[in-house]
Swiss-Prot record:
UniProt name for this protein: DNA-directed RNA polymerase subunit beta'
Ranges annotated as biased composition (Low complexity): 1354-1366
Gene Ontology terms, MF aspect: DNA binding; DNA-directed RNA polymerase activity; zinc ion binding
HAMAP family on file: RNApol_bact_RpoC2 (MF_01324)
Cofactor note: Binds 1 Zn(2+) ion per subunit.
GO cellular component terms listed in the entry, alphabetical order: DNA-directed RNA polymerase complex
Oligomer and partners: In cyanobacteria the RNAP catalytic core is composed of 2 alpha, 1 beta, 1 beta', 1 gamma and 1 omega subunit. When a sigma factor is associated with the core the holoenzyme is formed, which can initiate transcription.
Family: Belongs to the RNA polymerase beta' chain family. RpoC2 subfamily.
A Pfam family it matches: RNA_pol_Rpb1_4
Any one GO BP annotation for this protein: DNA-templated transcription
Residue ranges with Basic residues bias: 1-20
InterPro entries, per database record: DNA-dir_RpoC2_beta_pp, DNA-dir_RpoC_beta_prime, RNA_pol_Rpb1_3, RNA_pol_Rpb1_3_sf, RNA_pol_Rpb1_4, RNA_pol_Rpb1_5, Rpb1_funnel_sf
Organism classification: Bacteria, Bacillati, Cyanobacteriota, Cyanophyceae, Synechococcales
CC cofactor: Zn(2+)
């Protein structure tokens, strides 16, 4: 591999150190040209060029002085002129009104086309938006011209035009029009803001405009953070890229292609990879020459379209970039210096403009920008298509019928008759649109075609839009629509239009019928105003007694008492308390129930309506509850409401008074374990209620509780007796012996007690409460109908406390509660029970409680007709208090006709109820008089402008109903255009009201919704994210074969490869094909639309190439292809936002992302499968394998996103300081990694000088002593390794080292056979100078005599500091 030295030309100069600082050299080529006098207005751009030229020509000092002078000049005149903006400076161009008028005319013409059903709703929307966009652009031009011609010294214009402040888009909003705005969903609103800020916005416009303003503010805030993080990741991935070599000597290069014959700045500062020759093979630019603007211009003049240049992408310098491949440092436009940290410069150059990018994602709602590539006829003549022309019908997004070319061909316009002259030739590319037919004669300046740039199929997605009816009437389809029922995977049936056609709505008065109404008139009958069209009746479900209520709102309630129950033997007594009214029920025998409900309320089944207030089960104090055998309760999930008694019995109650004190012990006025009388003061101001023995509970000198237990205390020392009882207590039945001399005639509760002075038993009395099996129910009087729900009361007894529960209380508690709950069977959920208070029949002073189940029927009031309902008349068929049976009619409602006309009923299937009917009125028709023969027949549909007879054209749309010799009757109608595949919501003959949905238009729009722009897109690219819904890529090159499935949705796609292998591709629903049958495709080409997955793209390139080329070449070429596409993708995003970044910066970053490969099979090398390693390293390893005859490693190239690449860098210090510190450091420790401190970051962290700039020279010396890339390769100069660390662990030994090098871990040595095999495999002679690597030391880690090499080699090692003197 030879590297030719750069030929010295006037354009490249080599500078020695410091030459730039001391003597600014004038470049000889430029020195000869005399200074030219430029007499023109200097704006921002010209100023930039001027300063740049001065810097290149005269160096820093002169340029700085000139810039200073320019600043002073500017300030001087700015001060004199005192430029500022006043309202009068904002001059609105006169042409504005005309332009807006023209736009409105175009839009009303579009609306008219829509009204006539010539275009769909989508096409109308697209056309309107495009019209406004175009108007806005024309208005900007008008603003520019107005200022230029009428007021060139206008302050606003000067500022915007010179680039001092502001730009045209801001001026446009100040004096032009604000234009179209997007709504919060990102869709463009088709109502533009026509005014500007000078004229002032209307309220509506202001609100619309504030959407965008808010979005802008939020956007800016988010952008700064995102941009900063992007810069940090970029710096981390590229921080170790430093210019370390003069020339890497590579023969690889990249090709730069001219765009429209121009290279722009893309060649500047790059070195040519080979001689550039012109058309006559003359040498234009020698190899390795830096291209300056003059040379770039010469190359363009010579019409050279491709130039091979050197690039960081193809640089073969190890872990760095060489000067030649990098080219100029753009700071001073000279070849980059050694030691320049180009990685960090690249990272900052890409990250810094991030704040200028937008984050917005636009959903334009199917909007295509202004038509591009429109070709007009230059002459009049006859159109001729060439023989190979293939075209098909196409409808443009604006609804214009055109043709689309399927192949490339030539279209000629041939002059006819007297017009002799040259024919006009137009090259039509496939996908272009044609607006003329073959053989058609046309005039000059007619739009002939719209040419697309090559056969680029745009990525499209399906979107939908509703078609809303704006006229009530009957639906009719055009025959061409051919609706077809389609069943989807879920089994839902939808009706779809197969062809483009019209859906008509014919006018008429549509009546909505109530749910249970049925028509009483047949189809085709004439009706007058007030005729009954339909009747609806309401009937009772259960029957009962009718109550008529006062009307509420626009309906009247009829109540039917189905079941009622009166509590005749209870008085209803009302009490007033401060919290409101309380109602009690009192029986004759004095039992009182507290009502939980009040009259007038509604209750449901099972609800508790009253509680019995029973003093018999109330205690005087707290105590202990015990259930006697026989008493049982139902198990309940929660004990919140108590325990329901399932079987009655005896409840035992042991009284016990408990005072909760929580005061200081000093306040205690009695002694523990002493008997006290009722009324004793136990603590200051607290008195006992009962007599008994006191127990005091205290903690930390705080008095917690005082318990007073009733009963008598008997001293006893008999262990046997005491052991029969516990401190918790035992129940003793009457007659059972306790102690001598104690006669128990009733149940006692006995507890063992130990006082400080003596021991004994406390005998406590037990109270007994008898609980019945069933609670006593009040006597009721209830009604049971023959049909209807039953109503009754049920009493429930609930115990408040569970068995063994201790209630700590001074006041008494309620042990048993009796609840009254309502019980009703056969009641439907919507039937509620009403609570009423009624007077007693015999005594009006007494009120009784009455419970009734009501069936409530709302009867509609009579209504006057409105747009969707006819007038109704409702009649009640029952009287108050009348008894009705189940199924009796309560009311009938009649729907009356509003106007005279002809009734039509819709077609219904089976017994489907009729919900609408239509009356065709006189005003829905028009009679058109004709004098000659009619050209239409009954049933024809005509639109505005269609001929009815030879002399008369229709001025309306509709359907012909009658044709006679003198007149034609037309029924008004409204056509709606529906596109193929639209979903139809209505059937032929259906009746619709205004506002109903007729169809859902399915249309294709360019995928703009998902075109993520700006920063998120840059991030997506640099992080190599896998996009959602990615395109399907061709795995290997071949010929496409497309087969149509049974239903129109399913398409099978396969590619026939070289060896006749057929590769089938699974197509997902909604994916559009980007290829046609029989087309030749290459590996990596997208077969369907959608964003490209970069990882998959790399795999496809690699798999396609590795069958044709050696593994290494395939990897290099596939990586190179991916690199080029990534650089151009990133550039496109920045360019679209008007940000210029030099390619080389992006190339440095992309190089870092694509530098690694994944080992698939290690062969005989010491690499590990799955390991990520640099391609260069693998290349060297495989070369060594080729020499030794071992099996090479197999690998696949990988693409790493910037975050992943940063974490996979060779330096673990750099990776750990970036992200996931613990994981990175742990892994590095386990693997025993070494960090060579190559990058800037590692050195900064450790606190050394960084190996860039002035610190670079020291680093070069260090590098020269450093080991090569991998143990399997022998370094060239010394014939072997000198550092033990660089070796693989399986043959590493400890070895004396110079202090500069850290010692690595000692690992187990392989057995002698292994050692021998390793030596043989690598062709290594044990006596070579890297003997330490492959020799085996003895136990003391010393080498034996025969292991040591000859003294000369030893001396060499000692000199290098690798062996100590011993």
């Amino acid at each position: 591999m030879t590297s030719s030295k750069p030929k010295k030309t006037s354009r490249v100069r080599k500078t020695t150190k410091n030459s730039k600082k001391n003597n600014p050299v004038t470049m000889p080529a430029l020195a000869k040209t005399p200074p030219s006098f430029k007499n023109k207005v200097v704006d921002k751009k010209a100023l930039k060029n001027l300063v740049s030229w001065a810097y290149k020509t005269h160096g820093t000092a002169i340029t700085a002085a000139m810039a200073d002078n320019l600043k002073d000049l500017g300030f001087k005149y700015a001060t004199q002129a005192a430029v500022s903006i006043s309202v009068d400076d904002l001059k609105v161009p006169d042409a504005k009104q005309d332009l807006i008028g023209q736009a409105e005319e175009q839009i009303s013409a579009t609306e008219e086309c829509y009204r006539l059903g010539e275009i769909t709703e989508v096409e109308r929307h697209t056309k309107v938006i495009d019209t406004w966009t175009e108007t806005n652009e024309r208005l900007v031009d008008a603003v520019k011209n107005n200022f230029n011609q009428n007021d060139p010294l206008n302050s606003v214009w000067m500022m915007a035009n010179s680039g001092a402040r502001g730009n045209m888009s801001q001026v446009r909003q100040l004096v032009g029009m604000r234009g179209l705005m997007a709504n919060p969903q990102g869709e463009i609103i088709d109502l533009p803001i026509r005014t500007n800020f000078r004229e002032g916005l209307t309220v509506t416009e202001y609100v619309i405009s504030s959407y965008g303003a808010r979005k802008g503010l939020v956007d800016t805030a988010l952008r700064t953070a995102d941009s900063g993080y992007l810069t940090r990741r970029l710096v981390d991935v590229a921080q170790d890229v430093i210019v370390r070599e003069e020339d890497c000597g590579t023969e690889r290069s990249i090709v730069v292609e001219a765009e429209d014959g121009k290279f722009g700045a893309r060649l500047l500062g790059r070195l040519t990879a080979e001689d550039v020759l012109d058309a006559e093979e003359n040498l234009l630019v020698p190899q390795n020459t830096a291209i300056d603007p003059a040379l770039s211009g010469e190359i363009e003049k010579a019409s050279i379209n491709k130039v091979k240049i050197r690039s960081p992408l193809t640089c073969e310098a190890n872990r760095s970039v060489c000067r030649r491949c990098y080219g100029w440092a753009l700071a001073h436009n000279h070849l980059v210096d050694l030691g320049e940290a180009v990685g960090i410069i690249a990272a900052q150059s890409i990250g810094e403009p991030g704040t200028q990018l937008t984050m917005r994602t636009f959903h334009t709602g199917g909007v295509s920008t202004a038509e591009s590539g429109v070709v007009r006829s230059k002459i009049s003549g006859k159109v001729e298509f060439s023989s190979k022309a293939k075209i098909r019908g196409y409808r443009t997004p604006h609804g214009v019928e055109a043709k689309q070319a399927e192949v490339d061909f030539i279209l000629k316009i041939v002059p006819q008759g007297n017009n002799s002259g040259k024919a006009q030739k137009i090259e039509v590319s496939s996908g272009s649109l044609l607006f003329v037919d073959d053989g058609e004669e046309i005039n000059s300046d007619i739009t002939v075609a719209q040419i697309t740039a090559g056969a680029v199929k745009k990525s499209v997605e399906k979107a939908t839009k509703d078609v809303i009816c704006d006229l009530a009437g009957q639906v009719r389809y055009d025959k061409v629509i051919q609706p077809k029922e389609v069943t989807d995977r879920q089994g839902n049936i939808t009706l779809k239009a197969q062809r483009l056609g019209r859906l008509w709505v014919l006018a008429g008065d549509v009546y909505n019928l109530p749910p249970n109404a049925r028509p009483v008139i047949s189809s085709g009958k004439s009706v007058d105003e007030g005729t009954v069209l339909a009747e609806a009746s309401q009937s009772s479900e259960f029957g009962g007694q009718v109550r008529l209520r006062e009307s509420i709102g626009d309906s009247r309630e009829v109540q039917i008492v189905t079941t009622s129950m009166s509590l005749t033997n209870f008085k209803l007594i009302e009490e007033s308390t401060h919290s409101g009214q309380i109602y009690n029920l009192e029986s004759i025998d004095g039992i009182s129930y507290r009502l939980n409900i009040s009259p007038g309320s509604k209750i449901s089944n099972g609800e508790v309506i009253a509680d019995l207030t029973d003093e018999r089960f109330r205690t005087k104090t707290g105590g202990l509850v015990k259930y006697a055998p026989g008493l049982s309760v139902k198990k309940a999930r929660s004990s919140k409401n108590g325990f329901e008694v399932s079987q009655g019995g005896t409840l035992l109650w042991i009284p016990q008074e408990t005072h909760e004190i929580n005061k200081d012990i000093s306040l205690l006025m009695i002694e523990d374990m002493k008997w006290i009388e009722a009324g004793t003061e136990v603590v200051k101001d607290i008195f006992s209620q009962t007599s008994g023995i006191v127990t005091v509970t205290q903690k930390n000198d705080i008095l917690r509780e005082i318990t007073i237990r009733n009963g008598t205390f008997h001293e006893c020392d008999d262990e046997e007796v005491l052991n029969r009882f516990t401190e918790e207590g035992n129940l003793v039945n009457p007659g059972e012996k306790i102690l001598d001399g104690v006669d128990n005639k009733e149940i006692l509760f006995v507890q063992k007690l130990e006082t400080p002075k003596c021991r004994g038993l406390l005998l406590r009395t037990v109270e007994e409460f008898t609980i019945p099996d069933q609670a006593e129910l009040p006597q009721l009087a209830h009604v049971k109908q023959e049909k209807g729900p039953y109503l009754g009361l049920k009493a429930i007894q609930r115990l408040t406390y569970k068995d063994g529960e201790l209630i700590k209380s001074v006041e008494g508690v309620e042990l048993l509660r009796t609840h009254l709950s309502i019980e009703s069977f056969d009641a439907t959920p919507q039937m509620t029970i009403d609570v009423e208070s009624i007077e007693d029949k015999n005594d009006s002073s007494i009120n009784r409680l009455n419970l009734v189940i009501l069936e409530s029927i709302l009867v509609r009031r009579d209504t006057i007709s409105d747009s969707s309902h006819g007038s109704t008349h409702t009649e009640l068929q029952v009287n108050d208090n009348q008894l009705v049976k189940a199924g009796d009619v309560i009311s009938t409602t009649q729907i009356l006709c509003k106007e005279k006309g002809l009734v039509q009923l819709p077609n219904v299937v089976d017994d489907e109820p009729i919900r609408r009917l239509i009356v065709e009125r006189q005003e829905d028709k028009i009679k058109i008089k004709i004098s000659d023969k009619a050209l239409v027949k009954v049933g024809d549909r005509v639109v505005d402008g269609d001929p009815i007879s030879k002399s008369i054209k229709s001025t309306f749309c509709g359907e012909i109903e009658e044709v006679s010799n003198s007149s034609v009757t037309l029924r008004y109608g409204r056509p709606y255009m529906v596109s193929p595949d639209s979903v139809l919501h209505v059937k032929d003959g259906d009746l619709v009201l205004r506002g109903d949905g007729l169809a859902l238009l399915v249309f294709e729009r360019q995928k703009t919704g998902d075109i993520v722009q700006g920063l998120p897109r840059i991030e997506e690219l640099l992080e190599a994210r896998r996009p959602r819904d990615a395109a399907i890529l061709c795995k290997k090159s071949g010929i496409v074969q497309i087969k149509q499935g049974n239903d129109e949705e399913s398409v099978s796609l396969s590619v026939i490869e070289k060896d006749d292998l057929v590769n089938e591709y699974q197509l997902l629903v909604g994916k559009n094909l980007m290829v046609s049958d029989g087309q030749q495709v290459a590996g990596g080409e997208p077969l369907t639309d959608g964003p490209l997955n970069p990882h998959e793209l790399l795999d496809c390139y690699f798999n396609d190439l590795k069958d044709q080329k050696p593994l290494l070449d395939a990897a290099r070429e596939s990586i190179s292809k991916l690199q080029r596409s990534m650089v151009s993708e990133v550039q496109n995003v920045y360019k679209s936002q008007g940000v210029a970044i030099d390619d080389k910066h992006i190339e440095v970053i992309v190089r870092q992302m694509t530098s690694k490969v994944r080992i698939e099979d290690a062969g005989d090398t010491t690499l590990l499968p799955g390991e990520l390693i640099e391609l260069r390293q693998v290349e060297d390893t495989n070369q060594a394998m080729a020499i030794t005859g071992g099996a090479p490693a197999e690998f696949t190239p990988v693409l790493l996103g910037i975050t992943k690449a940063s974490l996979n860098t060779d330096s673990f210090i750099s990776a750990a300081s970036f992200q996931e510190t613990t994981r990175v450091l742990t892994e590095a420790a386990i693997e025993g990694k070494s960090d060579w401190l190559r990058g800037l970051k590692e050195n900064v962290i450790i606190g050394r000088l960084i190996p860039a700039g002035t610190g670079f020279s020291g680093f070069v010396e260090e590098l020269s002593s450093e080991a090569g890339p991998h143990p399997d390769i022998l370094a060239e100069e010394s014939g072997g390794y000198r550092r033990a660390q660089n070796l693989r662990p399986d043959y590493t030994v400890d070895m004396p080292q110079s202090p500069a090098v850290s010692s690595s871990a000692i690992l187990d040595d392989p057995s002698d056979e292994d050692l021998e095999t390793t030596r043989n495999r690598h062709g290594i002679d044990p006596s070579s100078s890297n003997f330490a690597a492959f020799a085996r030391p003895n136990a003391e880690n010393q080498f034996s005599e025969d292991q040591l090499p000859d003294p000369a080699a030893l001396e060499g090692l000692q000199e290098e500091g690798l062996l100590s003197d011993e």
